[in-house]
Each structure stands twice: as C-alpha cells, then as structure tokens.
C-alpha cells in the first residue's frame, strides 16, 4: 500500500496522520504527529476465536520511549521497564471512549499499541495517541462504530483554549480531555480550579465541536485505504428461550430487586439464576447454561431500567435525586497524622493522611523530565470490599485511575508549599463498595487532610451520577449504586467545593446524550455535592489548628545566600554536625531556604537556635556569654558565636604585669564579655564585665587584636603575638 497522508490544522499546530510506510504487517498502523511529537499506533485483531470468549478482550498499551526526548533510562538495566502510572492512565484514556463502539457480542481479541517515538515537551502526546488509535482502528478492518476524535480544552481569561501548550496549561484554570464521535460525547476527564457548571458544560461542547474536523479527516483516510470491514452480525437472540426465562424468573427477580441489602440481594439473585438454569436444562438438555445466564442478566437489566424510567423507587428505595445516608468519623486511627472513616450507604473508605518533608516527595522520572510530586494519593480496592477473594499486590489500572481522579479533585484546594511546607501522602482503603468509591475517596481525603491540620482552601466533596435512557425517556440518578452503574448508560463523576467544580469524569455507553441531559446531570450533581458538603461540615468544618502529636514538625527559615556556605561548612561538616547533634533533618536550597524536619519539637527549636547562632553577626555594644577558646601571652580568645571569636586583652584580665593569664582564666571557662569595638578588618575588642580583679595596668606594646575565626583556624602568627590575618571559611 502506498503511503497516505492527511494534514489538518488543530489548535496551534498541524495534525498529520500517515499510514502505509511503518508497521505494514499490522492490521492498522498510523503515525500521528504534531509539531515534533510523533506517536505510532498499531491495531491487530484476531479474525476468529471470539466464540470461546464471554467478554471483549480489548487491550490498550501506551508506552513512552526515552529516546523520544534524547534520554537514556535510569536504573541498572538502562531500558524501559514496567508501565509508569502516567502510561497506565493514558492507556485508560485511549480505552474508555473506543470500548463502547465495538458491536455487542463482539468477543474477538483486539490489541492497540501506542508508542511515543518523538516528543516535543510543549505538545502532549496523549491527545495524539487517542486520535492515532481512532485512525488505526478505522483502517484495520475491525468492526468498529467510529471514528472518534479527541481534544484538550483549557480556559483562561474567559476564553477556551484548544490543545494548549504545556506553558499555556500552567496558566489555565482548566485541563479537560474530551473524546467522542461526530454525533456524541463519549468520554470526559478534567481538572479545574473551582469552575462553574456552565463553564464546564461550555468546555465540553466547545471541545466536541473542535474535534469534528479530526473525525472528518480520519473518515477520509479510511476511505482512501479502502480496507473492507467484515459484516458483523451479533448472534441471533433465541426469542423462545428469552420468553421462557421471562416466564420462569421475572416475578422472582422483581422481588429480589426489592431487597435493599446488596449481599442479600446478590445471594438471592445467584440462587434464582441457578434455579432458572437447572429448570430450563431439565426441560431441554441441549440448551447452553452460559446462554441462559446471559439472558437472565438481560432480564435483570430490563427490570431495573424500566422500574426507574417508570418513576418507581430505585433498588435501595431512593428517588432519583437523594444521596445515600452518610456517616463520618474523623480521628478514626489513633497513631496516624490524620484519618477519616467515610461511609455512604454500602460504600466505605478509611482514608489516612501522612505528613512528610521534602525528602519524602516522589521523584517522577519520565520522558518529559524529572519532577517531584509533593501530593500523593493511593487508592486501594481489596477484594473483601465486595465480598470476594482475589489477588492482593500491585495496584491495577482501575485503582491507579480512581486514585488519579481523586487526586485531581483536591489539587485546586491544597495550600501553597510556602504556607504549608509538608509533603502529603493520602491512602484510601476501600473497605466496602457498592458504587462511587472514588467519590467516597474524595470526601474522605478532604476530611483526613483537615483532620491532619492541613489548611485546605475549601472542603471538597464528590458524587457519581448515572443515566438510564430508552428512546426519549430518561432518568438522571444521583449517587449511583454499583448495579445502577453496571446496568445504566452513563457514569458521570463530579467533585468540587461550594464555589465550583474541581474534577469531572464522564463515561457514556450510548450515543444521543443531549445538552438538556448534560445540563440536568450537572445541576443534580451540584445539588448532591452541596448536600454532602453540609454533612461533612457538620463533622469537621475547619482544619485542626494543631498537628497531631504524632506528626513531625517542619519549620522553614530564610537566610541570605552568602550565609549558605557558613551553614554547610567545609565538606558539609557544619550541617552534618547540626543534624547529628539535634537529630533534625535539615535541607537548604540555593536560594537560602532552610527546611527543618523533626518529630521532636524541642529538637527543632534547638536546631533553629544553632542555625541562628551560626549566621548571627557580633554587634558592638552587646554583652555575650562567651567561652574561653584559647589562652595566649597577650590575652585570651573568647568564643562569642559559633566560629566567631574576640580578643580579651591581658590588660582586661590581669591585675599587674607579673600576673599570668592562666592564673585568672582557664580554657573552657565561661565569662560575660562586652563588645567594645570592631575594627575595619573585622577584629573584635572585648571587655570583661564584672571581672573579679582590680583594673590592670597598661602593658606597653601589647598587641590588641581579635578575629571572627576560631583559634584552631589561626596561623602560627597568633602564638607569636603578630597581627592576625582574616581568612574566609
């Protein structure tokens, strides 16, 4: 096949789609490029074997190569390893809008691999990878009801930005990724700085409109490639069997869905499913048990959906707009820095906040460069939370994705590092789950942080919305259950403060979501969020004014840049000595900002005291409690501040010429001295306050000299009484 290229203007740059040159043995391969960022996306699908599956085995692998930015990977092996969290999140971003577009009962294996080959740091590869995946699917011959387009939308000064650069993103109040077909929005993922529902809805509509040119270009590319798609026909439904299942099980299934307790309801449905399979196999042993089970599931779906559309109570008895009962316990765990047990219906999370110092920040080394993450949020979904057994170990894609959503919801309200210098780690342990566990994590995180004393700008709550739609009839549901998510047409999560939205995630399984439906969903989400915030405020209205007694303390100091060397010392000796003597962790940056970190408040104060003494200047006219550091023939050197001595002349010590200094003072002795003066060379002249002996007679030709430096650093000239030269450390 000859090389085919399509090029369109998309935001600030041209988007180029090429096929026919690279990876020609794949069913579909597209090189998607934009201003130096190039992503190769391939699609391969098995033409048979689907009949043995009872699910759709679609896998999406997004991978970033370090050579794309001219870097060699770190680590011992010097090659790319397991996917990073960012790669996992972008894999999910590609997967979510395309999965609903494959035909029902299409169970053939499909694999999509997106590889970043070249990266311009100003052009994010995620949108390019999503568009490339859509194009590769469209030319692969796989049954796919696409193509889709994708776009990133920013918002600054009242204007929406299409595919903003990384620099523009830093100044934007919105980071929204949207994907969909030319007729419908399918997926939205966003982080915002407390924006209104109208602004968010406008961003979605703007992004959907802007991506239509991309979809048109992909359609043209597919036509030119000209690969025919096999006619895919879903297996014919056995209407006789369907009717028989309806006769045998409908009444019992309807009664089962009146059971409000999830585990009891599931147990009853499992019993009914087995009874139905046994009864029908007894009537006809040629029937397939899996087919009967699938049709039983369709019966469940029909019953639940029609009840809701008919205005009947939901599975747990609520109406469409009511949030489940909420209970909150802060300070749930005794020895943690901050904790919360958040329960909403049958969904529950233990959320724990831990405070650390700058050394605890996570170092992220990706192809975009190294960065430090000062706010980590880890979401864990153990199998016991849904009453099942399963593997426990590394987080799965879903856990990484849910944790990322909850993190984005809190980013807008975190205090500035200068205001609250702690590194924060949140862990959300989902202990029960029946829908919306990620939004329970958002609420629990907000409360746990406030319980830990973190001064959030505002509390954040989240709620998951659902949709049931059949023809022109629809119902928008607030705070959906797991079954309503599974059997419904939309999962729409919204998090925010009283002021506005901070995060939004939407996945739609059907086309035809109108602007009216979206507006109603946002309005109901605001109503639900406001209610939840009210309950949260009753439990903990403001952050704790004091940190937990088990939390470490951090103090930040600022010193002049020319004092940094003094604090560090030769070869780091001074700062190491401070750390060893006080037990305090000390970090100092090039601007002179010092961060002190210790679980011991007294140790922290001692370290501060010693640092202040290190950088303090000796002042004329001040009295100091000094220590005799060295005795010489013409007097004694008195240490006033760390590394800074002054000379107490023999005339201030001895009563007459015959008396020796050693007869009056000993090394290590503490005395109170007065700074009489400092000459141009920085030498300090001292007087002994309240000295015990009478005034000494003047000693002719005795040198009067002093220095800021300790005697250990003086040259042999000191002992001979010669002029002391000033040296720098």
Curated annotation (Swiss-Prot):
SMART domains: KH, S1. Mg(2+) binds at residues 485, 491. It catalyses: RNA(n+1) + phosphate = RNA(n) + a ribonucleoside 5'-diphosphate. Residues 552-611 form the KH domain. PROSITE patterns: KH_TYPE_1, S1. The keyword Lyase does not apply. The keyword Zinc does not apply. Its cofactor is Mg(2+). Residues 621-689 form the S1 motif domain. GO terms for biological process: mRNA catabolic process; RNA processing. One of its GO terms (cellular component) is cytosol. CDD domains: KH-I_PNPase, RNase_PH_PNPase_1, RNase_PH_PNPase_2, S1_PNPase. InterPro entries: ExoRNase_PH_dom1, ExoRNase_PH_dom2, ExoRNase_PH_dom2_sf, KH_dom, KH_dom_type_1, KH_dom_type_1_sf, NA-bd_OB-fold, PNPase. Its EC number is 2.7.7.8. Involved in mRNA degradation. Catalyzes the phosphorolysis of single-stranded polyribonucleotides processively in the 3'- to 5'-direction. Component of the RNA degradosome, which is a multiprotein complex involved in RNA processing and mRNA degradation. This is Polyribonucleotide nucleotidyltransferase. It comes from Legionella pneumophila (strain Corby). The lineage of its organism: Bacteria, Pseudomonadati, Pseudomonadota, Gammaproteobacteria, Legionellales. The gene is pnp.
